[in-house]
Amino acid sequence: MSYEEKLAKLITHHSLNLKKGDVVQIKAETSAEPLVKAMYKEIIKLGAYPFLRLFIPESQEYMAKYASDEQLSYLPEFDIKQAEIMTAYIYIDSTINTKSLTNADHSKIALMRKTAMPVREIMNKRELEGKFRWSLCPYPNQSMAQDAEMSLDEYTAFVYEACKLNEDDPIAAWKKVEAEQEAIAKRMTGTKWLHIKGKDTDLKLNVEGRIWENCCGYRNMPDGEVFTSPVENSAEGTILFDIPTTYNGVEAKNVFLRFEKGKVVEARAEKGQDYLHKMLDMDDGSRFAGEIAFGLNDNIKIPTKNILFDEKIGKSMHLAIGASYQEVGGKNISALHWDLIKDMKNGGTVEADGVLVYKDGKHIL
């Protein structure tokens, strides 16, 4: 069975658990055609209704470069209609130029994200009602491999292992992950305060009443994290994110944040500082913490400049600035959701209500 066929089966049968009658949108760059075909075929075989939303690699670049604010603010009615009727959504990450937006007008990128918010709000609402589910998965290419500083063969093998496609039964492998991570989610349930310590890091977060979600392949693929959304006005202290991340193709390195009453009041970065400041000023919610999570996928050991993988790095934590997750109790609304990652292997600790629960990347259960 090919990579495309194995991944299509994993996404449709495990991540989305598609059934006869489901209405499924596949959104992807044209460069992902082989995987799109495999997904389309598998969806039909399940008795569901696939429809395609393919786009050229340059589409966002052209919008940022040539579109007026009026054009960038236009939201087609059919986008709203699709969000209202589809029961499942697959986004295939196959960007052939991950740097295409590096020199774009970032205020225009922010406007595009704001314009699309009504669609995301509809999908979020329907997901909470149990009427909609989604999945994000990768299709390896030269650009992604180059970002990860690997050959295409090496990168494809890396993706295989991260997604457990190298296992005889990938679905069974993810079910095992689900059981292992559930112990962590249960341990964290009921916690009121987290205290995160490490290099240039001393941060407290209130997570009282919030749900800890076990992420084991039902949305993202690859997966491997346990997360929640902190109480919006609770973050106090400092944190250094020593693993580089990219957002809309722009890299930020060694991001340092200081929070007061939940809000970022100081932000520095060794690289990408101006961009960081623009993103923090995107809207009223963009300076608040929307997520705190443990990365648990030990098949992902190094950063690849792709957040789909990097936020799951084993023995790491990540905090997202911007939008929180309603399904776990989050209330922060923003067009921004930027995951920033911290290596916890060497001296990182987490206390839950004063009890040490995590040290050097390992949970103490």
For each predicted feature, which ranges?
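Extended hydrophobic packing segments that form well-structured cores
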Residues: L336-L365
